[in-house]
Each structure stands twice: as C-alpha cells, then as structure tokens.
Amino acid sequence: MREIVHLQTGQCGNQIGAAFWQTISGEHGLDGSGVYNGTSDLQLERMNVYFNEASGNKYVPRAVLVDLEPGTMDAVRAGPFGQLFRPDNFVFGQSGAGNNWAKGHYTEGAELVDQVLDVVRREAEGCDCLQGFQITHSLGGGTGAGMGTLLISKIREEFPDRMMATFSVVPSPKVSDTVVEPYNATLSVHQLVENSDETFCIDNEALYDICMRTLKLSNPSYGDLNHLVSAVMSGVTTCLRFPGQLNSDLRKLAVNMVPFPRLHFFMVGFAPLTSRGAHSFRAVTVPELTQQMFDPKNMMAASDFRNGRYLTCSAIFRGKVSMKEVEDQMRNVQQKNVSYFVEWIPNNVQTALCSIPPRGLKMSSTFVGNSTSIQELFKRVGDQFTAMFRRKAFLHWYTGEGMDEMEFTEAESNMNDLVSEYQQYQEASISEGEEEYPEEVSNEEE
C-alpha cells in the first residue's frame, strides 16, 4: 500500500503530531499501546499507510520525532499515547535552538540531521511503495522552522520523486511568543516555496478565534488548539487512510490543488465545529456542513478568502452522506459565490467521500482551499520582517551562527515575489490574452 512517513519537529510539531496520532489511533481502533481492538475491517484495510504492523496485533506509527531538546519528547512519552511510538524513533539533542532559525538550520540542527535521516531511511526502506512524507512544525521557532526546513531539503535530495506535505503553524499577528518570529517564518517560507509540494497553513490566532467564537471556550489551552488541528489533519488524510468512493493520495491532492508549483499554500477548515461536549445534541445536514465549511470564520489561517479568489479547492465529506446531495450543495456554493472562484479554471472544486466519520460524529467535512487571499498572511509576516530587518534588529543572533545578511534579503524578496504572484492570479481573467486586437472587436460590435 501507499505508505507515508511522518516527521514531527520542535515543540509545536511534536505537540500537534502527538494530537494527530491520538486522533487517528482512535479512528483505527488502536488503544494507547497500539493494540488493535476495533470493530470494522475498514479500520484495518489501509492501516499501513501510517502504521507498521508489529507482532501480536500491535501497530506502530511510522513517525519520526525530532527535537533539539528533550523536554517535549519526554512529555509525549509520558502522555496517554506515549507507548505507541517506537523508542528508536525519538531523535533529540540537548542544547535546544532557542527560537533561533540559524541554530536549527545550520549549527545545532545540522549536527543532528544525519541521525534523523538514518531513522527516516530505515522507515522508508520498510515501505512497500512509499508515497511521500508529511511533517508537522511551526515556522516561528528555531527547531521546527530551522531544522524542519533543513530536514525537508535533505529528504528532497534523497527522495526527489516522493511527495512532501507540511502542516505548518504560521506565526499569527496577535498571538506571538517570540520577537524574532517574522525572521524565522520568512526564512522558512523561503525554503517551503522551493521544497514542499503542499503546505497546509495553520495559524494560532485563527484557532484562538474559533475556540472563543464558535466553541465558546473562554480561555482556550494549547490542548484545545491542537485538538482542532488534529481534526483537520485527520480530515485531510482521511482519503489516504480509508478506502473511499473517491480515493486520493498526496499526489492526486497536489495535482488537483496546485495550478502553479510555487502556489502550494492551502487554507484549511473543518465542520462541524462544536465544542467538545455538545456535538451529540443535534444532527448535522450536508447543507449545514457545506455552509459552515466555506464560512471564513471556520478557516484555520487568519486570512479572509473574501479578499481574494479560490484557484482551487477540495472538500472531503465523511460519514453516511449521499453523493448527489454533496454534489448539489457544492455546485450551489459555487454558483452563489461565483466571484470568489477564478473563472479560468473550470471545475475547480474537487469533492471526495469517505464512509467512516470521525469519532463521536455522524458526519463531518474538511475543506482545503488554495486561495489567493493567503497572501495576506505572508504580507503580514513580511511587513514585520521588513520593520525589524531595516534596523538590523536581532540579526547578530543569526550572523553569530554563520548566516549571511544576504540570505535574509533573498528570503525577503522570495516572499514578496510569492505575494505578488498570488496577486497577479487574483486579478487575472479569461479574456487577458485577447487584448491585442482592439480594432477587430470594435468592428464586430457595429
């Protein structure tokens, strides 16, 4: 079967990763130590996309856990699903990256990277037919951002024809935990533009908003945020993990979603968003799911798609859903919001179905959109970057690890290019190629 190797790097990546494994273990009927006690053959059928089978009905995640300090790893190990992971797959340093991208990418991280690649290689060799890699990390820190992007480029070198998907937590405008986030994020985006095939952008602020507005949680914890992220990750990977009517793998997703190679940054959303205790009190319908899924308040990246246009998008419905109803609803959304979809890609909405709903829900839907409005997010980070870089603030932390100012300048301009590429396609229309013949057009009108 088509296996995926999962990597999680840094504190954020490991916490999101742990939540993801907890969610999908539940969906596949595995308990905290990886023993299968599920009820349906469907849970087993494509188990090997994410799990290796060990002896005695036990399944082990094909996950590599990486960090430059032992703290988060110990927390994962002590957590409810800590016994799930293979002990050899924990790779950690002792020094930490101290939120410094250069430490993760060039000094501390570079020392650890070969050790990680050995584990990755071992996992890849055990695969029947590897389809690709997915990595969870944040872009604002040192390890997830710096070392995460280093791993991506090394894996790219060694497995050039395999897919590379990233779940990247982008720094948010209001919720910031380090001053140098804009530097780390810009340097990371510079790498992701070149080396990733699909990047799902998640942003803490949008998650906070969802928790407060929709889930009515007065002070959300990181646990609540990670719960949301794991719901989306579980949704995005559904088609890979369960046999469905419209199956897909990482490559099919990319083929449908990425019209131009650099524009592979997706917004994700999930429905129904209900607070953890309340979901059992009412039934959800397909129209409600569709409406909620396309609601800007549901997007897990702080950019409003109404300020841009969708190049492509994809919706994954789970549960006992009628195909016809889904098709009708999706057509309906497109007709109502026709101005938010570019008209030069016909049929740019893709739907997939899977009959197994997530735990505790009758049906759900996950949304992945490639919208030009994601440029807001890069613009925001870029402005903060420029403000600091103009004064060369904090640069000595990076140059001290051997980085060059030139690299900052390159990263900045690459990100600005990305923003203007999105802008260009936002404004593009079908008739652009015909502007060279104004005379003929006027003749016809007479």
Swiss-Prot record:
Primary residence: cytoplasm
Coiled-coil parts of chain: none
Translocase among keywords: no
Gene Ontology terms, MF aspect: GTP binding; GTPase activity; metal ion binding; structural constituent of cytoskeleton
The protein's required cofactors: Mg(2+)
InterPro entries in alphabetical order: Beta-tubulin_BS, Beta_tubulin, Tub_FtsZ_C, Tubulin, Tubulin/FtsZ-like_C, Tubulin/FtsZ_2-layer-sand-dom, Tubulin/FtsZ_GTPase_sf, Tubulin_C
Binding site for Mg(2+): 69
Binding site for GTP: 11, 69, 138, 142-144, 204, 226
Superkingdom of the organism of origin: Eukaryota
GO biological process terms, semicolon-separated: microtubule-based process
GO cellular component: cytoplasm; microtubule
Acidic residues: compositionally biased ranges: 432-446
Localization, UniProt: Cytoplasm, Cytoskeleton
Signal peptide: none
Positions of the UniProt region annotated as Disordered: 425-446
SMART domains per the UniProt record, alphabetical: Tubulin, Tubulin_C
Keyword check for Flavoprotein: no
Sorted UniProt keywords: Cytoplasm, Cytoskeleton, GTP-binding, Magnesium, Metal-binding, Microtubule, Nucleotide-binding
Stored PANTHER family: TUBULIN
Its job: Tubulin is the major constituent of microtubules, a cylinder consisting of laterally associated linear protofilaments composed of alpha- and beta-tubulin heterodimers. Microtubules grow by the addition of GTP-tubulin dimers to the microtubule end, where a stabilizing cap forms. Below the cap, tubulin dimers are in GDP-bound state, owing to GTPase activity of alpha-tubulin.
UniProt record similarity statement: Belongs to the tubulin family.
Assembly behavior: Dimer of alpha and beta chains. A typical microtubule is a hollow water-filled tube with an outer diameter of 25 nm and an inner diameter of 15 nM. Alpha-beta heterodimers associate head-to-tail to form protofilaments running lengthwise along the microtubule wall with the beta-tubulin subunit facing the microtubule plus end conferring a structural polarity. Microtubules usually have 13 protofilaments but different protofilament numbers can be found in some organisms and specialized cells.
Protein name: Tubulin beta chain
